[in-house]
Curated annotation (Swiss-Prot):
A molecular function GO annotation: magnesium ion binding
Main localization, broad class: cytoplasm
Active-site annotation: 207 (proton donor), 343 (proton acceptor)
Top enzyme class: lyase
Pathway membership: Carbohydrate degradation; glycolysis; pyruvate from D-glyceraldehyde 3-phosphate: step 4/5
Keywords noted in UniProt: Cytoplasm, Glycolysis, Lyase, Magnesium, Metal-binding, Secreted, Virulence
Protein name: Enolase
Organism: Staphylococcus aureus (strain NCTC 8325 / PS 47)
Lineage, opening ranks: Bacteria, Bacillati, Bacillota, Bacilli, Bacillales
Domain of life of the native organism: Bacteria
GO CC, one annotated term: cell surface
Reactions accelerated catalytically: (2R)-2-phosphoglycerate = phosphoenolpyruvate + H2O
Name of a matching Pfam family: Enolase_C
Amino acid sequence: MPIITDVYAREVLDSRGNPTVEVEVLTESGAFGRALVPSGASTGEHEAVELRDGDKSRYLGKGVTKAVENVNEIIAPEIIEGEFSVLDQVSIDKMMIALDGTPNKGKLGANAILGVSIAVARAAADLLGQPLYKYLGGFNGKQLPVPMMNIVNGGSHSDAPIAFQEFMILPVGATTFKESLRWGTEIFHNLKSILSKRGLETAVGDEGGFAPKFEGTEDAVETIIQAIEAAGYKPGEEVFLGFDCASSEFYENGVYDYSKFEGEHGAKRTAAEQVDYLEQLVDKYPIITIEDGMDENDWDGWKQLTERIGDRVQLVGDDLFVTNTEILAKGIENGIGNSILIKVNQIGTLTETFDAIEMAQKAGYTAVVSHRSGETEDTTIADIAVATNAGQIKTGSLSRTDRIAKYNQLLRIEDELFETAKYDGIKSFYNLDK
């Protein structure tokens, strides 16, 4: 039977050693689902609230016992006494949103609500004897995503003196996901060798990418291109580059202040100068995607950037849109960006996550399913990417099990789909004039 009989949350640790919420859901027939909630480092100001305890004597204030209590003492009784079916995903999500009663899930915490939302979906898939991607996407979920592999970490994700937060490779020339993963891995290991020969550090950052002390942005880009070529692939044909600028992390009082991360040699740019700078990089290097190139509140700057390079570069809104359909709708109406980053914990339920993906795709925007810098062994985002035919996933570099777990899950899904599996490569960027 599909009726939920137990919902239980506990405090566990994420990949950064910080507490996070784990939720388990059980039905009367014994179907079971478990979910672990991720956490971000650079967060948009309009994100749903991640509830932390604030008790400095415990986990330096980052405990999540309040969120856990909200699941066990408020949400769980509502679900169990309401005799909700595990198949009633939308009803359960809407009930939790109403129970919270705030616009940003600040009462119960998005980390509490999301844990329940995903655990319910996993229990439903278990009840039906289906893989999660098939339960979420039906028979039509078959497209494997192009991986955006963050092989160099900067900004808030590392101690490297570079403002941009992520430097990514995208193996669009591969014919299968399995092949794309191999290409990325070979480039990653070639990059490590190049860094070692230069006497640069090969320690990795939060998302598994290297965080060496490059001389600047262009040094990082050119070194990555060197690694692509050393691995035997063609930059700009088989493998493209991408940035997550995370510009909100160094934007203040109308100025993009690179000195925050790059020291006294870091430039200070106006919005117009930031647009010019990004266009210069696009003209010079094989860049296909730029995330958060402008500050989340600099909509005029976003408009300029979109008009300037939006026909040839994917412009992804992360802090800009925060997986929120109200903000995304405004962006679509005003021609801001051409893609949305999808982070389940930015909005807090699977229902709202799927609504955002659907809205983007209907408007001709791409949707890039993404991890957070604080991750776990949970692989739900891999299943979401396939279920929604998103075509792109961003889940870190080629090291750290919290990142590799998602890649391995995609390998399993591709195997299960067998001949129906698709990997569209460059065609996944349907928002560009290619």
